[in-house]
Amino acid sequence: MADLGKKYCVNCLADVTNLRIRCAECQDIELCPECFSAGAEIGNHRRWHGYQQVDGGRFSLWGPEAEGGWTSREEQSLLDAIEQYGFGNWEDMAAHVGASRTPQEVMDHYVSMYIHGNLGKACIPDSIPNRVTDHTCPSGGPLSPSLTTPLPPLDITVVEQQQLGYMPLRDDYEIEYDQEAEKLISGLSVNYDDEDIEIEMKRAHVDMYVRKLRERQRRKNIARDYNLVPAFLGRDKKDKERERAGGTVGVGGPGGAVGSGSGATVVPAGPLGSSTAATPKRKITKEEKGQRTKLRALCQFMPQREFEEFFDNMHKERMLRAKVRELQRYRRNGITRLDESAEYEAARHKREKRKENKSIAGSKRGSSGGGGGTAGLGGGVGAGGGLGGGGGVSTIKEEGKDSEFSAIENLSGFELLSDREKVLCNSMNLSPMRYLTVKTIIIKDHLQKRQGIPSKSRLPSYLDKVLKKRILNFLSESGWISRDAS
């Protein structure tokens, strides 16, 4: 007699107690998986009817060839246990699955089926990528660990620590900035019966205190960055005196200390002094000292390195502006190449020297003229007149010798000439207006020839071939006309 507790397929009468497919529209239609997959139809049942899977929990998930005979209900208990207890806790997992399974069986079954089996090969990749994201902020960011890292203690002696009231282990001072800041929170206490307005007020006090602490730490960092503590203790002056004393030992002479306060720089002046200094600093001008004093309040908004770079860039800007003005002065004087600037500077130096000698001679001439008059009165008219006349002639000759452009400097157009053009006109004994006329005609004819316009040069009659040749050579050397035109 058939077992009443078993279920059979209505098509092939196979035992479907463990797993069967039940039709959702027909009554008492239960098929085995094989008949359902083949599309079996019995009576009013059709293969497109809805269905549901009925699991008795006693069939094997991995098939009859799997070792151990694990049922689907045990597999579900195993997955629930590993999710609850975690991988490796095999004793608790075995107790959760059932008393029939030992911890070793549970471990072997899970490793062989879920890790080394087909399911593990399909789900676990061969190379696991690194999905760990670094959420730490860069150095100096809002959440950077460097913000909470304490600064190293100051390198000062015990006497200096007592003088400053500095506590190196705490990196604090006996008298801090805003010493009364702790009074904001010293009397705060949170009670369970506080109202919302009281809680918000206490939070505001804490926020005010935190801001004061940040300002205190910011000022400490500024003092560290700009070395204000050594400057307060006078160490910078001692270092300057030591470096100055070290700079005196050498052939090149003593070194000079330039600047005041923490911005002072020591400039060694000699071969030995320059070799001892690793990075010699530039001299600080009086103008830059004034700018540093005016901008001292802005030091708190930038590091010392950026502050020094700012003044270095300003110094470079001044140097470039001076160089541009010098080049513009060369161009106004007709110099178009740098190799001509040395000759021009030498001539200018000589000219200034002659002017200086001329002024000295004029002052001497005035004093000697007065002396001659006295001598004439004391020694007689003839002798006085002779002395006075001789002095006047020698003075006129000296003045004519010192004056470089005395022949043309009072003529019209003299101020329109460059220094080289003045020398040229003076050497050719040519008036400035005549030279400017010839220069204009030559440049105009040269431009017309370059544009292909036929032109006939009509130079003035007072210009001979020698003067014309010299002027053409001068204009070509100065870059007014091309060399082939000369």
UniProtKB/Swiss-Prot annotation:
What organism is this sequence from? Answer: Danio rerio (Zebrafish)
An example GO biological process term is: chromatin remodeling
Give the CC-aspect GO terms: nucleus; SAGA-type complex
Give the source's domain of life in one word.
Answer: Eukaryota
Q: Where in the cell is it found?
A: Nucleus
Q: What GO annotations for molecular function exist for this entry?
A: chromatin binding; transcription coactivator activity; zinc ion binding
Residue intervals of the SANT domain: 65-118
Residue spans of biased composition, Gly residues class: 247-262, 367-377
Where does the chain bind Zn(2+) 2?
Answer: 23, 26, 45, 49
Annotated segments matching region Disordered: 237-291, 343-377
Please tell me where Zn(2+) 1 binds in this chain.
9, 12, 32, 35
Protein name in UniProt = Transcriptional adapter 2-beta
- Which Gene3D superfamilies would you find in this protein's record? 3.30.60.90, Homeodomain-like, Winged helix-like DNA-binding domain superfamily/Winged helix DNA-binding domain
Per the record, the zinc finger regions (ZZ-type) lie at 4-59
The record, for InterPro entries, names: ADA2-like_ZZ, Ada2/TADA2, Ada2b_C, Homeodomain-like_sf, SANT/Myb, SANT_dom, TADA2A_B-like_dom, WH-like_DNA-bd_sf
Lineage runs: Eukaryota, Metazoa, Chordata, Craniata, Vertebrata
Q: Keywords on this record?
A: Metal-binding, Nucleus, Transcription, Transcription regulation, Zinc, Zinc-finger
Classification via PANTHER family: TRANSCRIPTIONAL ADAPTER 2-BETA, TRANSCRIPTIONAL ADAPTOR 2 ADA2 -RELATED
Role this protein plays:
Transcriptional coactivator.
Protein encoded by which gene: tada2b
